[in-house]
């Protein structure tokens, strides 16, 4: 974009794709050039074009026919045949000849496409000039160049378009050509193809079974729920396709793969299993396998998730893709993730393990800002559950939400840290968990403080609540399952007044309503504190935010939580700070 393509790259592109078994077709010369090369003196002209540096070619294109003539006359001096051939063209025709490259020649393109009539992947390297047909053609700065009014008028006149008719669909073609083109377009396969009906929704059970265990991690709960679905069978399990960038075992996908197998076009037995070598992984590969294993390639991972998540509109068959990746390495594939969401692809992304709670593996494997990625990415709804039953509720919701016309892709941020589970009196909390948060310890009306927690530090938050509740009567503990949804709804409420609609109460406002107007909030999560600290702005409350805002390190969990101020003592200190403000 910023200049001309480096000459050395063309052969490099060939090598890369040919090594991978692709057919490479180079379209350098258009039909007019090839016909001219066949005439006396043409071989010398062809050799000159083939050896001309790209930058020189671009500059001459911008300078025009006279510059072409001067340069060619000087370089081909001593070749009467070539000079005679050049002399047959006036300046305008010479410029047209020299810029008749393969990528601008319709006949050349059609012939090349028609010749590739098999299923071998093919790379077309088509030579072009930047800004072809415009006054800025060939100039290295034309990526940011803007044509002035006079240049626009000249372009319009050269195309035979009358002033004021620039936006007419067939403008400048003439009646006969327009009639023929209209008929061609109307009869084309794209115009005649009917839009595929939306495929039926894959039924999702009313509830997912909650994995048993007094103490468990959200990552383990996720893996167990997927395993139970795989074992139970049914349409939902049959439509799930899993993938991971070489972290299948360490993200608890292994059980699902044991049940459903690896996808492979040619069947391949598990050699370790055949040799009776003990292994928890029993990975046979076959055409009906439902797991696609990738190397350490997060960009490919997100490209695959996006493609699988578009199966419904593309092929009329709905798939439910589930991809797991170490949470910090979401950042490696952000471009592919962004464009997948831009295309409204539907998938379940599981980022795990997350945060400094992955204490033993050090800062390179400990995520910090992924909650903010989840909040800021359009087309992606993010959740961070704390308990196994929340994982079950949110996974069930995700498989349903992914299929709704007004739904989106879903991101679950999970952890390998086991936490004690809580006993529920009823299921009333579930609807609020799906909306973004619920009171785990209900505050008294008019309470002056609350602890707001998200994710795996729930144990520290509960311990702090136990210690503080006598000193702070009515203290509440708010368990946020989705900073993303709370913030999104709050923002939409404020935007509504400017869009002509009446502002509607948002979930964050409703949750904080029982607290006193001057109440203080201690917010805490194993991630960027910015994911929760904004909650003070909902009702104008003071905030003492806790979280991670610098790289992690290797250590045991208590030491790391103490160092990064995520432990119970830090929450108590933050609560005390509220009343010193």
Feature names for model-found ranges:
Residues 1-168, 171-581, ...:
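Thiamine diphosphate
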């Amino acid at each position: 974009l910023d200049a001309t393509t480096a000459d050395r790259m063309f052969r490099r592109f060939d090598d890369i794709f040919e090594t991978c078994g692709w057919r490479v077709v180079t379209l350098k010369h258009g039909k007019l050039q090839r016909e001219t090369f066949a005439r006396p003196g043409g071989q010398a002209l062809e050799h000159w074009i083939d050896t001309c540096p790209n930058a020189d070619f671009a500059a001459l294109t911008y300078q025009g026919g006279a510059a072409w003539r001067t340069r060619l006359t000087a370089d081909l001096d001593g070749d009467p045949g070539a000079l005679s051939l050049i002399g047959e063209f006036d300046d305008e025709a010479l410029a047209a000849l020299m810029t008749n490259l393969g990528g601008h020649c319709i006949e050349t393109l059609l012939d090349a496409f028609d010749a590739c009539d098999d299923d071998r992947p093919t790379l077309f390297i088509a030579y072009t000039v930047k800004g072809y047909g415009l006054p800025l053609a060939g100039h290295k700065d034309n990526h940011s160049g803007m044509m002035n009014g006079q240049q626009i008028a000249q372009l319009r006149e050269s195309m035979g378009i009358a002033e004021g008719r620039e936006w007419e669909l067939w403008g400048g073609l003439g009646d006969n050509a327009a009639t023929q083109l209209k008929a061609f377009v109307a009869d084309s396969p794209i115009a005649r193809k009917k839009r595929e009906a939306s495929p039926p929704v894959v039924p999702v059970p009313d509830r997912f079974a909650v994995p048993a265990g007094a103490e468990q991690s959200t990552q383990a709960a996720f893996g167990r729920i997927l395993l139970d679905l795989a074992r139970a069978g049914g349409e939902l399990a049959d439509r799930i396709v899993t993938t991971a960038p070489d972290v299948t075992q360490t993200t608890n996908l292994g059980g699902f793969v044991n049940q459903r197998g690896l996808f492979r076009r040619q069947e391949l037995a598990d050699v370790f299993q055949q040799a009776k070598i003990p292994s928890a992984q029993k990975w046979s590969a076959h055409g009906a396998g439902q797991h696609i294993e990738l190397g350490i390639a997060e960009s490919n991972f997100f490209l695959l998730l996006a493609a699988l998540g578009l199966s419904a509109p593309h092929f009329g068959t709905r798939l439910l893709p589930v991809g797991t990746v170490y949470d910090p390495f979401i950042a490696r594939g952000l471009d592919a993730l962004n464009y997948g969401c831009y295309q409204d692809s539907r998938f379940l992304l599981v980022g795990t393990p997350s945060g400094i709670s992955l204490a033993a593996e050090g800062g390179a494997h400990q995520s910090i800002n992924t909650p903010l990625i989840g909040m800021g990415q359009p087309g992606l709804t993010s959740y961070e559950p704390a308990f196994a039953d929340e994982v079950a509720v949110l996974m069930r919701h995700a498989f349903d939400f992914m299929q709704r016309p007004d739904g989106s892709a879903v991101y679950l941020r999970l952890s390998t840290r086991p936490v004690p589970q809580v006993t529920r009196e009823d299921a009333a909390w579930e609807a609020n968990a799906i909306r973004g948060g619920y009171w785990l310890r209900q505050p008294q009306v008019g309470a002056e403080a609350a602890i707001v927690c998200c994710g795996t530090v729930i144990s520290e938050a509960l311990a702090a609540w136990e210690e503080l509740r006598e000193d702070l009567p009515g203290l509440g503990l708010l368990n946020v399952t989705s900073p993303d949804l709370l913030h999104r709804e709050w923002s939409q409420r404020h935007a509504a007044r400017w869009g002509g609609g009446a502002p509607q109460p948002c979930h964050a406002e409703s949750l904080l309503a029982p607290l006193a107007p001057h109440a203080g909030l201690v917010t805490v999560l194993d991630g960027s504190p910015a994911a929760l600290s904004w909650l003070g702005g909902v009702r104008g409350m003071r905030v003492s935010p806790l979280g991670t805002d610098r790289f992690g390190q290797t250590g045991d969990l208590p030491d790391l939580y103490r160092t990064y101020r995520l432990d119970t003592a830090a929450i108590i200190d933050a609560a005390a700070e509220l009343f010193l403000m």
